[in-house]
Amino acid sequence: MFVFRVLNTVPYTNRTGAKDLVASIHSFLTSNLLVGLAVLISWKQFGGTPIECMVPLDFTSAWVQYSNNYCWAQPTYFIPFTEELVEQVVDPADVVADGITIGNGGNRPRFVKKGGEKISYYQWMSFFLLFEAACFRLPCFIWKYFASQSGMQVGEILRVASDENNAVPLVKKANIDALCIHLRGVLRFQKRLKLKKIVPHKILRFLNIKYSAYYVTFIYFVAKVAFLLNVILQSKLLNKYMLPHDRQQNFGFDMWKTIFYGSTNGNETWRENGVFPRVTLCDFETRDMGNVQMHTVQCVLLLNLFTEKIFVFLWAWYILLTAFTVGNLFSWLFAVFNETYNEHFILNHLEMCETPFDKDDLKNREHVTRFITLYLGTDGLFLLQLIAQHADVVFTTELIAALFKTYIEIEAQRATLKQMNAVLPLLRPNDESQVESGKNTAPSTSHNVRRRGTEQLEKNVKSRQGSLSTQLRPFNSFEEPDQPTKKFDDSSSEDENSKKGSKKPSPTKKKASSKNSPQSSSNSRRPSLAHTASPAFTHHHEPDSKIPKTAEKKHW
């Protein structure tokens, strides 16, 4: 937004990265707005003339300055212009607490000044606004402090996700890989800690909540509730500080109604109700020739003109901010804890990625459900939704696709390990007789048994992977393309074995071998029967007729 860009140019007002729109409005826009209003009020208070009093004509300039300073430092009071300044006390025995006796002679009635409502909030207005600005910053500090204690560096993750250099393909790919590695490590740590079932973590679960898989989400909602409670509390303080009477609690609503309708419509103005009065009264004493004289002067509070407008604006702003915060809180509760919404969030992003993906397939939906519950968890899913708000849709889609590819690889490894665990007990001796018979057998026989068991295990694993690939048919394109297999020539190994196992040939044999050299060289290039039957070579070798000699020489 334009307002955020402008405020970012002002020192000490820059935003932190790990915040959403509501947090930015509370801790960034509102707090800076309150600071600006406090500066405006302070400039009027200390740099201008906040109050001007009408003094008697015999006052010198020094007495005028004194009366202005005194009435600014001391609270003033307000009496409506429709009422008399003095009133008669019927019973002379009455004690007047806030009045000054004018006539007092015997049993004659006394007249006293009315002690109107004391007004002193304008003296502390700038400090009150600064206090409110600090309160609006507090929930963000709570989120920043406690979220930094988790393994997920939320601020750094959002900074990388919203980096402007992600428009460069290489930079975007590097950032996605870095985020995948970081998230994979954090999620693996949380899963491993949960499987260990540490006793202190189970007993003192509340004190060890930062080790749980929902810690970041919990702190985020605590900050949301803190934002809501803060704006409600600030609204109450604003009314209590500036509107002392309960009958004036609808003053903000009446003022906005007056602004919209263009007239008071029967509402009281400051002349009647005394809310933000422009004219007040001030009493002070002077000594003249040893005698104490009481003076009552009438003062003009120009500062209340600004204070009234600030109150009306803040009253409406807090109402809108409360409604917006409540709506945002319930929307996040729905987004995090609604399973259907979470599944559609992942399915829609997987459907938008480059890999063909059918979100209506039941198998795909099952994998997405397992991906959310077993792999991401509450914090992982919440962080992806937070990234979706900060980063662009292309970056978010590719990041979710990369994490889903990692999940598919982990599922394939888990299926392979289950198959191996099912086959390995078949290769172990069941009783002591088999152990003794295994010891008495020849080494070649035991080697053949192990080799056959290994071949059977590899066949079972390959068949299991084949069945898994057919089940995960839409996700095959996540895998890297098959690299061309290298052709290995086993002639050198056969020659070395033949040299080691045989003696030096006779001269006649050398001649015979030299005559048959082309045939022998061609035969030496072909793998032996043992190598052909070995499972380690059957995957790489092809018939020799398909391999040209030039390619062999170039390879070697």
Swiss-Prot record:
One of its GO terms (molecular function) is gap junction hemi-channel activity. It is a multi-pass membrane protein. Keywords: Cell junction, Cell membrane, Gap junction, Glycoprotein, Ion channel, Ion transport, Membrane, Transmembrane, Transmembrane helix, Transport. Residues 514-527 have a biased composition (Low complexity). Residues 431-556 are annotated as: Disordered. It comes from the Eukaryota. Residues 452-461, 539-556 have a biased composition (Basic and acidic residues). One of its GO terms (biological process) is monoatomic ion transmembrane transport. Its main location: membrane. It is found in: Cell membrane; Cell junction, Gap junction. Residues 500-513 have a biased composition (Basic residues). Glycans are attached at residue 267. GO terms for cellular component: gap junction; plasma membrane. Belongs to the pannexin family. Structural component of the gap junctions. This is Innexin-7. It comes from Caenorhabditis elegans. The gene is inx-7.
